Amino acid sequence: MNISIPQIIAAILNFIILLLIVKHFWFDKITAVVDSRQSEIINKIEDTDKNQKLALELKEKNELELSNAKKQGKTIVEEYKSKAENVYEDIVKEAHEEADRIIKKSRLEAERQKKNAEEEIRAEAVELAVLVSSKTLEKTIDDLEHRRLIKDFISKVGI
């Protein structure tokens, strides 16, 4: 295959003419389509970047709200725990006070019963003393009999 210079020049001229025809009729349209597609791609990239930034902002906002909610929940739990402890302490304090009142009342009642018992013993002692005196007056007793009566009296009284 032989290639000659006039063929090369003819091919170059044909290519230039074809290029000029394409440029004149279709190059503006092709450039417009390419530019349109390029701007569309750029807009989509920008929208994607905006959406990604918005998503990150929303994520940070949600994480902050979640953190605040956890803190608030912890605060509420601690507050109710503190209130429950205060109620517990109040109940225990009231129980101790009630127990102290019951003990004091029981001691007072025991003291009252003790005094009543002492009064009864004194009354019995007086009665026994009167009885012993009347027996003594009824008969004359010697010193030994007198001591025996006193010992009986003391043993009955419980002194």
From Swiss-Prot:
Membrane topology of this protein: Single-pass membrane protein
UniProt entry keywords in alphabetical sequence: ATP synthesis, Cell membrane, CF(0), Hydrogen ion transport, Ion transport, Membrane, Transmembrane, Transmembrane helix, Transport
Cystine connections: none
GO molecular function annotations of the record: proton-transporting ATP synthase activity, rotational mechanism; proton-transporting ATPase activity, rotational mechanism
Location within or outside the cell: Cell membrane
Listed Gene3D superfamilies: F1F0 ATP synthase subunit B, membrane domain
Segments passing through the bilayer: 2-22
Gene Ontology annotations for the cellular component aspect, listed alphabetically: plasma membrane; proton-transporting ATP synthase complex
Superkingdom of origin: Bacteria
Family indicated by similarity: Belongs to the ATPase B chain family.
Assembly: F-type ATPases have 2 components, F(1) - the catalytic core - and F(0) - the membrane proton channel. F(1) has five subunits: alpha(3), beta(3), gamma(1), delta(1), epsilon(1). F(0) has three main subunits: a(1), b(2) and c(10-14). The alpha and beta chains form an alternating ring which encloses part of the gamma chain. F(1) is attached to F(0) by a central stalk formed by the gamma and epsilon chains, while a peripheral stalk is formed by the delta and b chains.
Identification of the protein by name: ATP synthase subunit b
